[in-house]
Amino acid sequence: MENQAHIAGEKKGIMEKIKEKLPGGHGDHKETAGTHGHPGTATHGAPATGGAYGQQGHAGTTGTGLHGAHAGEKKGVMENIKDKLPGGHQDHQQTGGTYGQQGHTGTATHGTPATGGTYGQQGHTGTATHGTPATGGTYGEQGHTGVTGTGTHGTGEKKGVMENIKEKLPGGHGDHQQTGGTYGQQGHTGTATHGTPAGGGTYEQHGHTGMTGTGTHGTGEKKGVMENIKDKLPGGHGDHQQTGGTYGQQGHTGTATQGTPAGGGTYEQHGHTGMTGAGTHSTGEKKGVMENIKEKLPGGHSDHQQTGGAYGQQGHTGTATHGTPAGGGTYGQHGHAGVIGTETHGTTATGGTHGQHGHTGTTGTGTHGSDGIGEKKSLMDKIKDKLPGQH
């Protein structure tokens, strides 16, 4: 189903464009229906294999994209959230989960194998672009979301509050690999771009978020308060590696760009945040209060290494720039914060293990050409925008 909005100025409803552009591939496709009422959709020579043994509501979409969608469409709140997720044009492969999955959605573009989880997963979503294998978790995962390598370039649309929060999370341009967690994860989100393996946690992770290599390029959009908080977190353009924590993590966030392995903690981590290599390029946007708080944290250009503590750390912070290894403490540390190396290249940010709480690892975020371009900033805009700026 190809929906290419070539005619500008179309007035559309709220729910009309949420799913109308998901499948839009152009090539040879192979569709293999699953067993036990399993729908599978594949484009571009991509084998979409449905799950087996009692799966329900499994949706497999491969090779969807927006082609020549002219700006100027009047859209609602929820219209642009998912309309730009996949846009690849190559061979894809998607394999559905097995054994009792529910609500599984796998979207893969550009030769990307998106493999669904196995054994009782619910609400699993895997999206991968540009040769990226997105592998879902196994054994009872719930709410797993994998978004890889989607982005918008020069859109210029006037959008609402929630429209731009997730539409630009992935914007990488390379081979990616995303591996979901295993054994009872909930709310797991893994995003990887540019050949970046984003490994999800295992054994009962909750709220795991992995964002890698997303960015906006010359958008020029007028955005609200919450629109730019997350749209510029990842913006790297290289090979990345992200490894999620294992064994009962909650609220784990790992973001890695430019060959930077950001290793999440293991064994019951909470609120772990790892951000690597996010940046904006010549945006020139009018921003609100909270938009610029995190967009300029790191801006350096060297190799860095950060190693989180192990065994029950809380609030771990380690700051290291220019090849400096900042080793976190072990066994029950509190209030430790780790910001490493702005615009990192080959930087290794390793999260703590065994019961860490509130671990924050930020590696390699930076802005390029966003200074002195007429941005209107508020009270909290410049609090952290100049922390790391080594070049």
Swiss-Prot record:
Region named 6 X 23 AA approximate repeats: 9-391
Region called 11 X 14 AA approximate repeats, residue ranges: 49-363
Biased composition (Gly residues): 361-372
Biological-process GO terms, alphabetical: cold acclimation; response to abscisic acid; response to water deprivation
Sequence intervals crossing the membrane: none
Domain notes: Contains 6 A-type repeats and 11 B-type repeats similar to those found in maize, rice and barley dehydrin and rab proteins.
PANTHER family tied to this protein: DEHYDRIN XERO 1, DEHYDRIN XERO 2-RELATED
Known role: May reduce intracellular freezing damage during winter by hydrogen-bonding to the lattice of the nascent ice crystals, thus modifying the structure and/or propagation of ice crystals.
Similarity comment: family membership: Belongs to the plant dehydrin family.
Protein name: Cold-shock protein CS120
Source organism of the structure: Triticum aestivum
Higher taxonomy: Eukaryota, Viridiplantae, Streptophyta, Embryophyta, Tracheophyta
